[in-house]
């Protein structure tokens, strides 16, 4: 399989972003056994490919075990993943659990199956990780998934909550990691096409229309078309939180402001920002000063004392 220079740049970017996420969040450590969850979709194929590449040159030793959960969906091509995983030389396990029948029995026709399906999958994955001695569980969620989840929780749950790149399971037995947290869905899709991964569609829930996640995803993609880079900016915001400028009394001691126990810089008190204001001009207008808008720019880092 021959590839262009554009492909190698794409591959390098994905590997670099994944390596940075692993380092930033301490996702993988020396001696870890990582259970790589394979659904047969573009995200999990890409995750495995990138992790295998990083494993070869990482300064630490860790083990990868690929896992696929055969949920007994009618028409599921059982041979595809075993053949692929064997061809790339990774240790793997196929776990059979008829979660499909349970979902179809419990969920009324026309209702979303995602929630129950996800809970059942988690249970099987955690049990498999324990049986195999895997202390890390890798999922294929990417940057766009994280931003999508943030808006879902905000719109429908009233919480500023996203999808963490790393978290512990409820019983503390395993750490769940998302190595593709810094990678865009667009890059992953391009990589999967170039690599010609044998993609397996999700027939159980993929055809259900008008789901909240689908609507939010469409909204974000429209924003991205109108203003390229917006999804990346939103993700950057999730990594640059200022608790004193929100309204959660659990995150910031607002009551302490009256007694000097908590402080906020004085510029913020008067609404000053670190944004650069630029003139807003209209098509055919010669007047560049009729209105101004705010454009985000990070404030320059303060120079050390004594710097000329």
From Swiss-Prot:
Disulphide-bridged cysteine pairs: none
Keywords: 4Fe-4S, ATP-binding, Cytoplasm, Iron, Iron-sulfur, Magnesium, Metal-binding, Nucleotide-binding, RNA-binding, Transferase, tRNA processing, tRNA-binding
Gene Ontology annotations of biological process type: tRNA thio-modification
Coiled coil: none
Gene3D superfamilies according to UniProt: HUPs
Signal peptide feature range: none
Binding site for [4Fe-4S] cluster: 114, 117, 205
Protein name: tRNA-cytidine(32) 2-sulfurtransferase
Species of origin: Cupriavidus taiwanensis (strain DSM 17343 / BCRC 17206 / CCUG 44338 / CIP 107171 / LMG 19424 / R1)
